Structures are given as C-alpha cells and as structure tokens.
C-alpha cells in the first residue's frame, strides 16, 4: 500500500517536471533566435490590440469599483480612530503594493489568458500549426512569440491604469461622497507613498505576473488535446494555474520587497 502511494507520488512528480521541461523548451524555442522585427512587428501590434486593448474595459470598470469599495471600507474603519484624513494613504498603498498588480493579473488571466489558450488550442485542433511546419514556417516564432511579448507588455500598462482609476474611485467616495477635504486626501497619499519604490515594485510584480500568466496560457493551448473537450480543459487549467501562480508569487515578491 505504501509502495503504491510512493510510486503514484513519484509518477506525478516526474510528470510535473516533464511538463515544466516542455513548457520551458517551448518558450526558449519561441524567443531565442535571430529577431525579425520587420516581419513580426505587425503580428505584435495585432496581438497588443487583442490582448491589451480588448482587456481595458474590464480593467477600468473593476478598478473603479474596487477603489470605491476600498475607499468606503477604509473610511468606515478610519473614522473609528478619527483618522479619516489618512484615507488617501490607505487607498494608494493598498492599490500600489497589493491589489493593483494582483487583481489586474487575475482579471488578465480570466480574460486574455483564457482567450490565448483557446486560440492556440483551436489552431492545434485544426492543424494550422502543422500546416505552418509543412511550409517551413516556425509556428513558435510566428504564433507564440508575438503573443508572449504582447502579454508581457500589456499587463504592466493595464496595472498602471487599474491603480490610477482605483485611486480615482477611492477619491470619489472619500472626497465627493464622505466629504473628506481633498487637500488632506491627496497630501496624505503624497507623504506616505514612496513613488519611486512603490511604483517600481508594483511594476516589477506586474512584469513577473505577466510573464507567468502569458507563459501558462500559451503552453496550455500549445499542449492541449486537439478536441473540443481538450481545449475546454486546457482553458480551465489556464485560469486555475494562473490564479494560483499569481497568488503564490505575490507572497514571495511581497516577502522579498517588504519583508525587512
């Protein structure tokens, strides 16, 4: 009984390592090589639109409402200690250090990541990738690489937008609704936030999350079983694995950045 359990555990561990190896080789083969900017630039621009611009609506709307909720809950707590003038500090630090990068990455995984997986999986199911290989076109360089760089570029920009509209949403609640003096709100935020460190750390988190989410999304699509059920399972795996990876990496990065 114990030997069977150990054998099963070892089999799963080897399978996981093999999957990581295939994912690493896919990304390496897609990115390493002679750059062809003139040929791939139109593909990159198109994917920036598909991955980034089409994700802006959910990012902006979610950012406004999360900022408003954060402003309202923060106001209710701070008024208990007669510290409601510190609401701007609370909203800005919460969004810059944690909520902005994490929530933007989770929304990006749900919207853009799942779309990338479904698109690549469908291309494999309809043998478009095999057709490219037959025509001496590297599908990794033509299909995977532009989508990867589009994700890496888009998510940090979407995170900045999320944080900006979130702070604006918090000011709507705190200043326009609850009547906090706007000077107190913005000055508390400016005094408490180290824009160089907090903004840089926010961007570092968003870049790490962008690489992770885009990599997982593309590999799950590339490795999907070429059936409708296989593509469906691959899309589900993308959202689940990306969400867990973002939350786990967030703890690691937070411990490294603010653990001292």
UniProtKB/Swiss-Prot annotation:
<feature type="topological domain" description="Cytoplasmic">
    <location>
        <begin position="1"/>
        <end position="50"/>
    </location>
</feature>
<feature type="transmembrane region" description="Helical">
    <location>
        <begin position="148"/>
        <end position="168"/>
    </location>
</feature>
<keyword id="KW-1003">Cell membrane</keyword>
<feature type="transmembrane region" description="Helical">
    <location>
        <begin position="239"/>
        <end position="259"/>
    </location>
</feature>
<keyword id="KW-0813">Transport</keyword>
<dbReference type="GO" id="GO:1990531">
    <property type="term" value="C:phospholipid-translocating ATPase complex"/>
</dbReference>
<keyword id="KW-0812">Transmembrane</keyword>
<dbReference type="GO" id="GO:0005548">
    <property type="term" value="F:phospholipid transporter activity"/>
</dbReference>
<dbReference type="GO" id="GO:0120014">
    <property type="term" value="F:phospholipid transfer activity"/>
</dbReference>
<comment type="subunit">
    <text>The complex is composed of two ATP-binding proteins (MlaF), two transmembrane proteins (MlaE), two cytoplasmic solute-binding proteins (MlaB) and six periplasmic solute-binding proteins (MlaD).</text>
</comment>
<dbReference type="InterPro" id="IPR030802">
    <property type="entry name" value="Permease_MalE"/>
</dbReference>
<feature type="transmembrane region" description="Helical">
    <location>
        <begin position="51"/>
        <end position="71"/>
    </location>
</feature>
<feature type="topological domain" description="Periplasmic">
    <location>
        <begin position="72"/>
        <end position="88"/>
    </location>
</feature>
<keyword id="KW-0997">Cell inner membrane</keyword>
<feature type="topological domain" description="Cytoplasmic">
    <location>
        <begin position="220"/>
        <end position="238"/>
    </location>
</feature>
<feature type="topological domain" description="Periplasmic">
    <location>
        <position position="260"/>
    </location>
</feature>
<dbReference type="GO" id="GO:0016020">
    <property type="term" value="C:membrane"/>
</dbReference>
<feature type="topological domain" description="Periplasmic">
    <location>
        <begin position="169"/>
        <end position="198"/>
    </location>
</feature>
<dbReference type="GO" id="GO:0005886">
    <property type="term" value="C:plasma membrane"/>
</dbReference>
<feature type="transmembrane region" description="Helical">
    <location>
        <begin position="89"/>
        <end position="109"/>
    </location>
</feature>
<comment type="function">
    <text>Part of the ABC transporter complex MlaFEDB, which is involved in a phospholipid transport pathway that maintains lipid asymmetry in the outer membrane by retrograde trafficking of phospholipids from the outer membrane to the inner membrane. Probably responsible for the translocation of the substrate across the membrane.</text>
</comment>
<protein>
    <recommendedName>
        <fullName>Intermembrane phospholipid transport system permease protein MlaE</fullName>
    </recommendedName>
</protein>
<feature type="topological domain" description="Cytoplasmic">
    <location>
        <begin position="110"/>
        <end position="147"/>
    </location>
</feature>
<keyword id="KW-1133">Transmembrane helix</keyword>
<dbReference type="GO" id="GO:0043190">
    <property type="term" value="C:ATP-binding cassette (ABC) transporter complex"/>
</dbReference>
<dbReference type="Pfam" id="PF02405">
    <property type="entry name" value="MlaE"/>
</dbReference>
<dbReference type="InterPro" id="IPR003453">
    <property type="entry name" value="ABC_MlaE_roteobac"/>
</dbReference>
<dbReference type="InterPro" id="IPR053408">
    <property type="entry name" value="MlaE_Permease"/>
</dbReference>
<feature type="transmembrane region" description="Helical">
    <location>
        <begin position="199"/>
        <end position="219"/>
    </location>
</feature>
<keyword id="KW-0472">Membrane</keyword>
<dbReference type="GO" id="GO:0120010">
    <property type="term" value="P:intermembrane phospholipid transfer"/>
</dbReference>
<dbReference type="GO" id="GO:0015914">
    <property type="term" value="P:phospholipid transport"/>
</dbReference>
<comment type="similarity">
    <text>Belongs to the MlaE permease family.</text>
</comment>
